[in-house]
């Protein structure tokens, strides 16, 4: 590989970070007079194309350079395409459900606010905990990925890069809040699209495919793992996207429903193309003889073995793209954590500098864990399993037909789904320890058995079983209590219809102060 020199590598990396720092702080200076609400969100202000670039930048991260090629080397064309489609298509969910949630909760800017108004404070805190943990895990995975990738590309120690990235994004995000993240993501998203095109052309010109290796690899054939992924990945990624506050912040920031639909549609197509191209590098690395190499290397480095056949300038372009991807993703996680913590834990009443300080403090354990982090893909899967047990029972509340569905059922269902995974693993493997390891997806998705598949079936199915059992328990308790006290049994009574004055047919973009509704019923 045309590996840049020590001096060139440092110059490319730190000049890129410096450019983003200057850009971010310059924008923050222009926004220095913004009010607290604008720091946390930007409801009803953004048009379609900035939204599209933001969804692209927020959905990507440097980890895609390892995870998608790795899946391609393990499952071939089938698994790679399933992964790309499963990652891109869930963006459309925000176009479909975003308008519904905004009409029900126009003053919100994260999903947890809708959960508070629909299911009560305890359910909101439960989802908030899951959201913050998910963002924490994603921050770890992003730092771990950028550290590993910089080492692979340049031979440099990844730790200083991880620290500099934390410092840069923390400075401009703490100064400007969500708007900074939105504007920098627009720039970074544009850069990434351009750099992807350049890299694709370079690979097409410089890499030679060996026809014999194409047939020998077996990548054009379907596999058992590939068919398992056809279920696992859509469930995992679809549900996990609900935990990512950066997507909800951008959903609420759209000026109109039409802008939102155009934005997510463009982002979906762009993400599908980008992720397919990145994943294809794993196939091309194998078919060109660059991977697995001698001695054989992990599939997660397939993309970087391919770079050995490319000139130095391409590696420099990839390095800039990697830093841009990682910075865009990381500042999105930070701004999402600030907005979520402020809204969920403090009801936006605490001084914003206190929230900023908490986010800065969280950076220390993030860096410490990222240094020792396992596979980036495994971190994603742990978060996916948690969301697969929580989100399905949560979504029932979007329908007015399930007005009797309460927060008690949501929490019991979420915990019960994880417990069901443990029970399944214990029975399937014949060991409680193995059942616990299945909760951490320690064997990944490619162990050759049905453990991971069963876990992602057990999580949503178990959550519904436990949730409906909780519903029966709650209704029984409330019925018995009503008989004992002489009070009417109202648990199944439909809620009073909102007056015409309260109904909002369209999402308001005016600057009026909207009074937050009270919490919904938990029990």
Question: Where on the chain are the PLM-derived regions?
Answer:
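Membrane-interface helix-loop-helix modules in multi-pass membrane proteins
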Residues: 40-107, 247-292, 305-325
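Selective recognition of specific alpha-helical transmembrane segments in multi-pass small-molecule
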Residues: 129-140, 191-202, 229-242, 257-289, ...
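Hydrophobic alpha-helical segments and their helix-loop junctions in multi-pass secondary transporters
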Residues: 27-32, 136-143, 147-152, 156-164, ...
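Loop-to-transmembrane helix boundary motifs in multi-pass membrane proteins
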Residues: 118-125, 136, 332, 339-378, ...
């Amino acid at each position: 590989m045309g590996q840049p020199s020590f001096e060139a590598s440092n110059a490319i990396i730190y000049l890129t970070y410096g450019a983003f720092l200057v850009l971010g702080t310059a924008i923050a200076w222009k926004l220095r007079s913004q009010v607290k609400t604008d720091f946390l969100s930007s409801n009803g202000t953004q048009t379609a194309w900035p939204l599209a670039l933001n969804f692209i930048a927020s959905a990507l991260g440097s980890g895609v350079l390892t995870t998608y090629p790795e899946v391609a080397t393990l499952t071939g064309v089938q698994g790679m395409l399933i992964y790309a489609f499963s990652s891109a298509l869930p963006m459309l969910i925000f176009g479909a459900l975003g308008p519904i949630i905004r009409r029900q909760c126009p003053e919100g800017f994260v999903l947890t606010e809708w959960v508070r108004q629909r299911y009560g404070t305890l359910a909101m805190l439960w989802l908030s905990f899951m959201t913050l943990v998910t963002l924490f895990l994603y921050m770890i995975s992003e730092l771990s990925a950028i550290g590993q990738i910089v080492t692979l590309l340049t031979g440099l120690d990844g730790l200083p890069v991880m620290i500099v990235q934390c410092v840069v994004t923390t400075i401009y995000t703490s100064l400007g809040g969500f708007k900074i993240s939105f504007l920098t993501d627009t720039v970074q998203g544009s850069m990434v699209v351009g750099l992807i095109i350049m890299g694709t052309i370079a690979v097409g010109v410089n890499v030679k495919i060996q026809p014999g290796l194409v047939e020998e690899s077996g990548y054009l054939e379907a596999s058992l793992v590939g068919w398992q992924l056809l279920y696992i990945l859509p469930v995992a990624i679809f549900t996990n996207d609900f935990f990512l506050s950066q997507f909800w912040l951008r959903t609420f920031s759209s000026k109109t429903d039409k802008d939102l639909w155009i934005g997510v549609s463009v982002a979906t197509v762009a993400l599908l193309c980008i992720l397919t191209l990145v994943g294809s590098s794993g196939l091309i690395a194998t078919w060109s003889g660059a991977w697995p190499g001698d001695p054989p290397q992990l599939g997660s480095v397939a993309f970087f073995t391919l770079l050995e056949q490319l000139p130095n300038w391409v590696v420099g372009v990839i390095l800039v793209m990697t830093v841009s991807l990682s910075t865009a993703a990381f500042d999105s996680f930070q701004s999402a954590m600030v907005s979520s913590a402020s809204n969920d834990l403090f009801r936006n009443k605490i001084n914003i500098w206190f929230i900023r300080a908490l986010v800065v403090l969280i950076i220390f354990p993030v860096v410490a864990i990222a240094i020792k982090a396992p596979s980036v893909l495994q971190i994603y899967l742990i978060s996916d399993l948690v969301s697969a047990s929580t989100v399905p029972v949560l979504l029932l509340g979007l329908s007015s037909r399930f007005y009797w569905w309460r927060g008690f059922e949501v929490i019991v269902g979420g915990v019960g789904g994880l417990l069901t995974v443990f029970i399944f693993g214990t029975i399937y493997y014949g060991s409680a320890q193995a059942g616990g390891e299945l909760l951490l997806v320690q064997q990944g998705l490619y162990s050759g058995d049905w453990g991971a598949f069963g876990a992602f079936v057990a999580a949503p199915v178990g959550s519904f079983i436990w949730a409906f059992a909780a519903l029966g328990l709650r209704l029984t308790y409330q019925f018995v209590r009503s008989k004992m006290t002489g009070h009417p049994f109202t648990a199944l009574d439909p809620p009073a219809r909102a007056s015409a004055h309260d109904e909002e047919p369209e999402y308001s973009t005016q600057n009026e102060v909207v009074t937050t509704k009270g919490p919904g019923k938990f029990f």
